[in-house]
């Protein structure tokens, strides 16, 4: 395999860059390098980083980058790294792979690393950072010192990754601590980029105050999943109040009405609300269909009376004031 020396900028810099005009990345026979790889892995496990670097320096550029990639892939990321291993991996992340191959992308030939060990090193560093955040958050949560505002603020470039670490930390806590954190979060006016945190806590605790916070958020699939948990944690008047409150959000109104009508027995508050919604020009037909499925004679009688009035007198805003729901049914 003969490398091609690029004169510029390679010779000017004194470090030639290698490339090959082949459609597939070059293949180094793994069997030939297996002994070296096992030796390198053993040295790495024992913290002998100088020995690792010395052996790699004796290899050809292609073999060195291949071995580096395999070595980094074999590192265990299920536990935090030692400071020395972290520093060694960070040093690899700062290097630029120089054994390149040409590949056709969208009709153009582009040069790409054959063995991108630097990208693998950056991946390891990111995974270790996640573990470190997770451990810190768990300790703070257990001690009652965690502050949601330390993560949730506008402009935080690490918000998505830190939220993922927080959710992993919460997964390891008992329900009693989750209930405490749910009440703390409900009392705070902080920025939330989505409803993942609210949905997770509600699916574990059913904290009523947290539902109220959720109804004020933009609706997404996590909000719908959290709405569905109400009937699992609450019954009777409490469930009725939560679902009626949810129905004030136009994007939650239809699923909230469906859940409300499914309460059994149906609380008086829910009956009155649903009968009142018959006058809603947007949702009246849906509510009528839902009420006809309810096995309660008194409610069915009231429904028949309302529908009879509707047949005799066309529904108008004067007879049946609109509940204030928008004219168009929004999509979920």
Predicted regions and their residues:
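N-terminal signal peptide c-region/cleavage motif recognized by signal peptidases
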Residues: 14-16
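Sec-dependent signal peptide recognition
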Residues: 2-9
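Alpha-solenoid helical-repeat scaffolds
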Residues: 58, 75, 79, 111-118, ...
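Short, solvent-exposed helix-helix connector turns and helix-capping sites enriched
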Residues: 44-48, 60-64, 194, 205-210, ...
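Hydrophilic extracytoplasmic domains
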Residues: 244-332
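Amphipathic alpha-helical scaffolding segments comprising HEAT/armadillo-like alpha-solenoid repeats
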Residues: 164, 176-184, 195-196, 206-214, ...
């Amino acid at each position: 395999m003969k490398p091609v020396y690029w004169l510029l900028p390679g010779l000017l810099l004194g470090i030639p860059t290698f490339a090959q005009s082949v459609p597939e990345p070059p293949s180094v026979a793994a069997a030939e390098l297996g002994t070296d790889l096992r030796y390198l892995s053993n040295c790495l496990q024992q913290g002998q980083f100088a020995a690792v670097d010395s052996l790699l320096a004796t290899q050809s550029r292609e073999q060195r980058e291949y071995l580096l990639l395999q070595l980094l892939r074999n590192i265990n990321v299920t536990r935090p790294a030692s400071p020395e291993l972290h520093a060694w991996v960070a040093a690899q992340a700062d290097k630029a792979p120089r054994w390149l191959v040409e590949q056709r992308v969208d009709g153009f030939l582009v040069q790409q690393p054959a063995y991108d060990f630097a990208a693998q090193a950056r991946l390891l560093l990111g995974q270790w950072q996640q573990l470190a955040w997770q451990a810190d958050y768990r300790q703070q949560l257990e001690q009652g010192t965690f502050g949601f505002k330390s993560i949730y603020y506008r402009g935080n470039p690490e918000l998505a990754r830190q939220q993922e670490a927080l959710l992993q930390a919460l997964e390891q806590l008992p329900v009693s601590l989750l209930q405490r954190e749910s009440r703390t979060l409900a009392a705070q006016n902080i920025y939330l980029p989505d409803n993942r945190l609210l949905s997770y806590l509600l699916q574990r605790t059913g904290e009523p105050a947290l539902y109220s916070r959720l109804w004020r958020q933009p609706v997404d699939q996590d909000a719908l999943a959290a709405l569905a948990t109400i009937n699992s944690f609450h019954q009777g008047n409490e469930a009725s109040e939560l679902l009626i409150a949810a129905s004030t959000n136009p994007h939650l109104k239809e699923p909230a009405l469906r859940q409300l009508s499914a309460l059994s027995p149906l609380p008086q508050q829910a009956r009155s609300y649903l009968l009142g919604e018959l006058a809603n020009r947007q949702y009246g037909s849906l509510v009528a269909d839902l009420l006809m499925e309810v096995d309660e004679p008194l409610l069915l009688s009231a429904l028949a009376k309302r529908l009879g009035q509707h047949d005799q007198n066309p529904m108008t805003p004067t007879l049946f004031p609109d509940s204030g729901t928008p004219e168009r049914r929004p999509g979920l």
